[in-house]
Amino acid sequence: MTKTSGLALVAALVVALGGGWLARSRAEAPHHAVPPSADGNLVVGLCDGVTSAEVQGVKEGERLTRSQAQAVSDQLMEEWRRKNPQANWDDARAVHVAQAAQGGALEQSVPPPEGSRPGASIKFGGAGAAEGAREAAQTKQGGAPQGQTGGGAGGMPAGPQGPVQDGHTYGAFSQRDVDIWKAATDEFVAQGDRIFHSADLLGGTIGVSCDMCHPNAANTHPETYPKFQVQFGRVALLRDMINWCIENPVRGKPLPDDDFKLRALEAYILAQRRGVPLEYGKH
Amino acid sequence: MAWKSIETKHYEERDAFFRGLGRVSRRSFFKLAGVSAAAALAKGLVTPQSFQLVELAWAADDGGQAKPKFTFAYISDAHLYEQKLNDRFVRAILKAVDDVNALDPQPDFVLFGGDLAQLGQPKELTLGRDILKTVKAPVKMMVGEHDWFLDMGALWQQYFGPTHYSWDHKGVHFVTIMSVVEKDFWTARGMTPMQRMQTVAGLDNGVQSRFEVGEEGRKWLSDDLAKVDKATPVVVFSHSPLYKYYRPWNFWTDDADDVQAILRPFQHVTVIHGHTHQLLTNRIGNIQFHGMLSTAWPWPYAPEGLPKLTVQMNRADPFDQFDGCGDGAVDVLENGLANALYNLWDRNPITVKASYVASDGGQDRPPTTKLPSF
Amino acid sequence: MSRQTPRLAVLAGLIVALPFVSRADDASVPKLPLGISRTLYEVSVPKGAEPTPEKAALGDKLFNDKRLSVNDGVSCATCHDPQKGFVDHKPLAEGVAAPKERTKRNSPTVLNAMFNATQFWDGRAPSLEEQAKLPILNPIEMGQKTPDDVVAKVRKVPEYAQAFQKLNGREPTYDDIASAIAAFERTQMAGDSPFDRFIAGDEKAIDASAKRGWALFNGKGRCTNCHAFGTTSPLFSDQKFHNIGIAAHKTDFIGLARRATTIVRSGDLKQIDEVAIQSDLTELGRFLVTKQSNDIGAFKTPTLRNIAITGPYMHDGSMPTLWDVMDHYNKGGVPNPNLDGGMQRLGLTEAEIDDMVAFLATLTSDRFAAFGKHEMARQRGQKTKRPERDTDAAMGRKGNLGDLAPNPNLKNPAGIGVILPPKS
């Protein structure tokens, strides 16, 4: 979705809603009085009711070309962003997964909504994305006019960097997907949490549970595996050590490789160490 | 029921063996840590590789200021289950009892640092009480949260008396307080006593309230210390650290600032605390803090909040149930401060000296850790 | 114990560094027996110190030469008999002062000794060269008074004078003699055992009982923490020092330690050697070297390779058979104030003990296979005499000697950690 058509959509919505509202109370209707241009140039107002831009070289009443319209919209959006730094405007930025431990959620951009036109391949993300978007559009054989990709109510969201890639394979997942996936993962980790804290669930016979020596999985250092594990005199993976601990300090039966409990414990331990850099072999 | 560890039985067998050989020497069974001062100096025990006998501290020419006036020992955080469920923790506390019973000379008293039981069960407390009866020196008891929150201290107080008490010993004022009071978190949740106990027993669940001495406790402490001269050395026994180390694990006393304010007017204050199951050292103003080791298991160091004076003990080896655990002794010095001897099992002992703490780490630094926990 | 950690750190560092630091000249690493890893060789034999055939042959001769002793009666081979697994099969070594006076320690094997981080039961010698020098000068082992006496004797032998001249271009010194003996010892690698073939992929190399024993070794037996085995580090020893309570029931550790702190001069290798070999302070083990309370009564974990043919066992030779050794561990050792915290009762049944002994027997190198069979038969004959056995303690019916895990029921109980698959 281009900025202009997006803007147009929003403008249309505002008018539609505003119109209804206006119909109720014409007397209090806000009116965006765009400042007139000294040279009689076209002045375009933004839907926030305060921002406007003067278009040099185009007189009031003239039509703008596509590229001119795009440039004006870009300018208005930039101005609006500058005025509203905290605004939660969903634009088409690249998806990235949080590196640091910033709470639980994967940070996501809004992925393209359903029904986006396939084949649209606009570059997005980072500086100059708008440029890239225009470039990519230019290299397309025929197809959509410059800068335009999907359209209509179900078109791809557009941000300053351009629209987001779409598709049906994994890489084009949606926010709904993210929510479900996160819930499933956290559920699994929560199971591991339960087992980690319970001598009975671990199969321990002396009332010792993992959290007694490893509160919040402290000192488990899963990021250091594979490493030489002194307790068995050879190299080990995390799950080897989990099983060894179950057998020795916890006094239970080591779990088979395909046991749910072993995997859940592994999941819990790894989840507690989010953000810690991998450093295999570290002691 | 007579509580004798297998080690004690062997001591007795050896005693008989040597008596038979005409080479009997009571003094032979003593751990080197307990070698008395005069004997140590007479033998010229200054070889570079010898482990740091606490007594060697007085080799320094400081007019005898750093000479121990007297010593007390401690056993802490036993976390006993009933023996048929868990024999391991019983074995460990018996080892500690053997250690303190084998000291020569005997310490003036032995402090029990709290958490005698794991889940506050009558059987656990009774077991602990019976084992501690075999300690030769007089035992001073301190309560921990694992002892309290099943029946809110009913059985503990029946067995061991009041939670707050003080006494004077060789010119030092000792105070034992209860610092594991918690604001009610269980009634609103409709918890049974066992559920409450199990919640408190978990370090990292974040449900229980943070520890505090509480208003009553602080008032008691204030009143008690009001009668004490500000120049008298004060030693406080507390289960929680009486400072703020790591809140999520309740390595924490919520009203620490208030308690420290009560202690501030005194020239020499040492706090000996349990709960943290690790070698821990801190200084806040005039107060020096030494954590006690547990006999049952070691805690890792918290991800943040570790006092900068603490030189970590090495990471524990889970193969060895005793590694990272132990007992210890505290030498109360002529100058009123205290050296803490950590008798780490299966490792060389470590002494954290008052001079190290007082100099903010400038001198007498304990040996560095080779492998910290993380 | 702290003395060991720098070495271990170096070892670890080298193992990590090895992919990047390999021998430019591959010919310098001899062909290794099956089971001896290249890592172990490269860590143990410094580049440039690889034995040459001439030097090793010279060392061989010296090793077997009784003239090195004061009375021409004892050679290295007397206590380290090459035909008998490089040990003498006596509980305590006997040198020039025998039978009047025996040493206080059992002779360790030379097989794979080159891979030890330190030499002797208490690690008092840092290298094979330093080790070779001490028994020759010990009053009751080979009895020579000074290194000069030894050198004089060796120089008088034309064969040696010529050989050393050829080797070094000059007359031999005491260091040269030790160096030649060490070179010979560096050729005594011993792998090639049925167990090594099993690890290399031959499922039939060891029988079912030994396989069960191997599983127990990794699990219920609690062996791997000290007798570590991995394909990169196949020595069956962590090279650390542990007090496992041998002879603790008749040893007054504390009294001995108090005496030792005053008598023993740290750093004086000769004096420590004499104290260890000749006096009752021998039981202090590593403490004689470090004087750290953690080391009281602690002795080095020996390799288990060829264990069947290197009895009697332990630093004082007090365990005649492997069954006695198993009994000792099964009951949790003998309690004493410094007992290693890893020691605890194991709860092994007789069948499990038999399985573990069967496994240990598979660690015998092929060249000693016949002798190994003979030794195992002899030991098995003594199975009924079990003075160390204390089943009540092992099964937990008396004493507080540790808790046990329930028996594991995994498909492959030895499958913990990574054993590298055989190279295809």
Which ranges hold each PLM region?
Chain C
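Periplasmic c-type cytochrome electron-transfer domains
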Residues: 2-7, 20-424
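Bacterial N-terminal signal peptides
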Residues: 9-19
